[in-house]
């Protein structure tokens, strides 16, 4: 997947202020994983890249409060137009982020997480 910031930075804005540009084909990084990095939770969501901008595809799911991974998996499986390869790639990256947060992330600053996962869009307070 292309870095989230790179995808959004490449978007062109037309005279009406609307993002325009290339919409990736299947398996070309059509999605951005968004992470809300908090001291006691991490939340995951997925946006779809459309016309050079992004549009929310899923809700935010929290870990460990809920089983964020399982809920994300279920929601992605309900979208039949998402390829198996895309779904696996998204869920694998979600697993990496959750594992990092559980093992080290609670003690790491948001900026360190951004450096570890440059292809993911982060926000938060931790």
UniProtKB/Swiss-Prot annotation:
GO molecular function: structural constituent of ribosome
Keywords: Ribonucleoprotein, Ribosomal protein
Biological process annotations from GO: translation
InterPro entries: PSRP-3/Ycf65_sf, Ribosomal_PSRP3/Ycf65
Entries under Pfam families matching the protein: PSRP-3_Ycf65 (PF04839)
Sequence similarity: Belongs to the chloroplast-specific ribosomal protein cS23 family.
Subunit and partners: Part of the 30S ribosomal subunit.
Function, as annotated: Probably a ribosomal protein or a ribosome-associated protein.
Protein name per the record: Probable small ribosomal subunit protein cS23
